[in-house]
Structures are given as C-alpha cells and as structure tokens.
C-alpha cells in the first residue's frame, strides 16, 4: 500500500529534521542526571494527562526550547512535526489569522475567491481561544493533534488542532525572562516577560515581543517585516479550587513584501521587482484580543468557562501585470473583523470507571473587506510601471470589490470513556453544530482610463475604449447559507503493559460551509454576480496507533497509520476574468482519499546523547473527476493534478544533540538537524494553465510555458547546525546557529495572475546568535 511513496524504511533512516539549531535545556537533552525520558503533560483532550497515555497522534514542542533555538514563527515552531505543513501566506492575505494556512495529514484549507478568506482546515487555539492570535511569544508549549477532532474542538478541526499555550502568572514568585536574537538581514528579535505577585491570591504577567528583519531578497524596502506584540495576564485564585485568568493582548504585523515577484523562467530563476514604496506598510495585520478562563473544581467534576472577544484588521498591497497589459497596484483592506467565542464545559474528575465531559459553544464573526486596483507608474516601481505623464498623480482606478458578512455557530458536545477492565477502555463522543452565514459582495468597474492609465471622462467613454457600451458599477445581492452537522468518535484502547499502548479509532470532522460570490459576465457585456456556496466537507478517519516506552524509559516509539475518506473536497477554480481583470470562479467538488503514517522515535542513547527521528507519509489523491453540476465539463478541466498540491508525500527529520557538562557545571550542547521534503507542486492550476505552447494560455514570456513548471520543486534536504551554552542554574544561555547550510532555495509560494507567475522563494542560508537571561 505504501510503496507508492517511493521511500523505503532504510532510506528514512538517512533523512532529517528542521529548525534553528540552538541549545536545549538540560532536561530536554537528558542531562538532568535521571537517564530517562521526561514525562510531558498536556490538555489535548480537555483534561490534564501524560501525552503517552492519550490514545491519539500528538506532538508537543516546549516553549523554552523553541525560544532558546530562535524558533519564533509558526512555520519554524511546526517545521519538524510529522505530516504538518505550514503553507505560504502572502502578506496581507492571512485569512483573519496569521496561522490560517496549516495542513495536517494532507487536509488543506478551502481556497479563497477574490480576496474572501475560506475556512481553515486546522483549528488554531491560543490559550483555549478558537482562532486566537498572539501565541508565538512567551510560549509555554504547543500541542499538535493529528486527525479530525470534531467532537471536542468542532469547526475547522478536520485535519487536526494546533493549540498554543502561553505562560500564566504564578503566585508567590517574582521572575524576569529576557530573550534576544540577532541574525542575517539585520534580524532583531526580542522578548521580555515579567511575573509579579500581588499578594497571596493575585499575580500578573506582562510580556512584550518585537521581531524586525530587512528580509533576504528585494532591494529598497524589499521583504522587510516588523512584528510588535504585547500581552498582560492577571491570575486571581481566592480558593484552591477556583482559578480565574483574564488576558488582554495586542499586536501589529507589518511587511513590505507585497511587491511583484515574477518567475521569469521555468528553471527556477526568479526576477524580483519592488512594489510601490509610496504605500507603507505594503501589508499589515493588526489585532486586539481579550479573554477570560475560569475553572472551579466541585470535587466530583470540574466546571470551565472560556470566553473571548477579539478584532483583526488587515491591509495589503500587491503589484501585478494585467489587462489591458499595464501594471496594476492592488490595495486591499478590511474593517476590523469582530470575533466572539464563548464555551462552557463540565468534566468529571479522573480516576473513576466512567469519565465524561459535556459542553456548549458559541462562536460569531462579523467581517468586511475591500480591494481596489489602480494603474501603476514607472516612478513608483521602475521598469514594472508605465510612463507617468503627470508626476504625483495616481493612476486610474480599474476596479474595486469587497464583501461584508456575518457568521454564527452554535454547538453542543459530549465525550465519555468507560474502563471495561484495568487495561481496556472504550470511548464515544458526539457533537452537533449549527452554522448561519450571510454575505454581500459589491463590485465597481471602470475602464475610463487613457493610454497613460489616468481616469478620463465618464461612462460614455467606455464604448470608445472597449467597443461595447458597458455600465460602470455592478453590485450583488446577499448570499446566505445555513448548515447543520453531526460529528462522532469511537475509540478502543488497550494497555499491553503500563508503558505500551495500542488504540484503534474511527472519527469524523467537518470543514464549515461558506457563502461566497463570484463575478458572472453576461452576453451583453454587463456583469452580475453568482452565488458560490461551499457545502460542508466531511471526512471520516480510520486510524490505528501505538505509543511505547522501552529500554527502561530511554527509547520512545510512537506511530499511527490512517486512512481518510474525504467526500466533496472543494476548491474555487478560476475560469476566466471580467474585462477589468477581476477573476471568475467555479467550485469544484471531488472525492479524495488519504493514506499515510506518522512515526516518531526519541532515543536517549546516554544521559548526554539524544537522537530523534520522525517521519510522515501521506498519499493524498483525487479518486475521480465528475462533471461540474449541470454541465458536461469534467472537473479535471480546472484541476490539473490528481495529487493534492502543497502536500509533500514524504517528510522526515533527524536531530542529534550531545551535552558536554563543563567543570563549572555549565552545559555546552552542539546540535545537528536535517529535514527532508519530497518534491511536488505547491498550488492548484487548471489544465489550460498546465499547457505549454498555446499563446496566452499559461505563464512566462508570451505565456507559452506551463505554470506548473514554475511551481514544481524537486526533493530537497535542509541541514541546520547550532551550538548552545547554558549556565549551571540555567540563568544565562548563549546560542549560535547556521540555518540551511547548503543554501537550498525553492519556490515556497506561487500566485498566478493574468499569466504572470509571481513566485516567493524560501529562506537562503542564514546565520544568527541569541541569548537568554532568567532571574
């Protein structure tokens, strides 16, 4: 079954991992003197448990280690987690959340239409808040749950869950932590966190983070980025069994990476042009978030309430080349999206023959965004623009579009586990969701510009320009969609020994439906809109796994095999464009099946030597291409690949660290990592875009080259090296690293627009050093 991956077991042993290579803590390297692997406690199933005792495929990354290794971004945090892919997100297009493009086991998010974000296939939580933001600093740990988690986590947990847990305040302990990093491209990254007790029942923790980089590729402003974040948490614990944590956070993500990046050859050579520098920042996200977490232990049960409100504002800028063959600046922005999440759950205390959990959840989102395209001049971007006849005067507006809408989701859920015997347990869970959504899309079109791209005249000039009288303004009515969904989980687990667990599970997940709209040109040249209602996508998972500790707790072997039946996998495929260049979409819906495995081994060879090998295999294939509803056009017309793009068929990570204990008790840790990724394509394209030799059909000069040639990357391996020093009590730490030793560059993301393949490259070789101080 797995031979199609083309990867033997012996080959896996030669493959490797990722991440900046810096010193780990003494305990993470087994240097604490215990000589055994440490226990890791998580709340993945809404209870506090040892991760080795949970019958599910889970990975954990500790915040202290990630900070010491300089791994700050979501991509870096998750880069060595098996079968997890963080897709490229163009700045200013982060789908209401900077973490909105995570795929687990091949389950990718719905492609957006015309700037409208689609639902995420991975549920991201920050401090128990769904779609929370700001979890990448002052981080305690990250939990990654692979496989559908619909019963406990609900909407968007089709592929799995990524849960960020930041540090809570601590009573009766004053502490300060400072992290700093400097690296290639003037990278400056720093975090400060202060824990301040305010009596026996009250404590506050304040954390601030800043991350700035000039980027690696473009001149002038190039891909400069800047991140500024802050959070304050207040802990109130008047009773031993009552705990209240309230939090407020704010952040600003700014980037100048919205300029044009054009792949000029199909061999990987990439030409980069800057976008206009008159708009600053070119892309940015801004958020504020407020949350409260209250838990009360009754003795026989624990009641938990989690409530949050947050807003998200986004703007973006991009330069493209479009009809009528003149450069275009696209400016996008959103009014603050408003999010409201409320959850109440009651769970039995562990230890009984029957453990249970019941809960209710409410989630709402109100959103609005606009996008405007104007002609771009040479004075703004050099060779990418046309001659500016009147310096200082903006080019004409070509078109603008936008959307606004609201979404509400109501849910009830429950899960019970019954101990049939001391070593045999059965679990059943269920969840019911009801979603209500409305959306209005509006569209303005203007071709009243002359050969210099400046606005001239009124709508009467349209006939002279196009030969056809066209109206100037188009609008659309509401699209509405209501969905109800039921998900379930059935699982059996058996303890072969106290350190060896075997489990089998059938579970379901769903990706929420969505109401979107697309331009729909009519025969007379006018444009109306058609509704593109995405149905709910349902996935049924069959999984068998095992978790093991052997050799006196020095070797850990975890693994799982899975089969997914994914009915109605949907994507918005571009079929053409309006006279102004606005894209026109249809929805494709095809059956998909995923087959794969996760494997993770950690071996404490000696108290000073740790070796980690993990691997992920997934074969994500479209099994058939039915005709589009109401047509005789096969959906393969709009889907060039049978294998889902952006999902590597194989990844593997190999990590080795050795701890030297010096005479004064300090620790020196050299570390080496290697990460292997199988080749493939990163974005979906149509059959026409995948055709060579047809003028105007595909990409490149003359649009004669298959867009797929620009997008494909071969297998690659990234090697990272690092060296870290830790003081005897862990108060001080110094680290140095080299990432991507071989300077391997590949296309990380591709945006195809009007035959122009805009490519975004991966990071080159980088160097850096970091420090931390804790007292």
Regions found by a protein language model. Give the residues of each.
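Structural signature of Gram-negative outer-membrane beta-barrels, strongest in the C-terminal barrel
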Residues: 235-241, 346-349, 355, 361, ...
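Acidic, small-polar-rich N-terminal luminal/periplasmic segments of exported/outer-membrane proteins
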Residues: 36-171, 544
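Gram-negative outer-membrane beta-barrel transporters
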Residues: 347, 356-357, 422, 426, ...
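Membrane-embedded beta-barrel scaffold of Gram-negative outer-membrane proteins
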Residues: 291-318, 495, 501-513, 517-518, ...
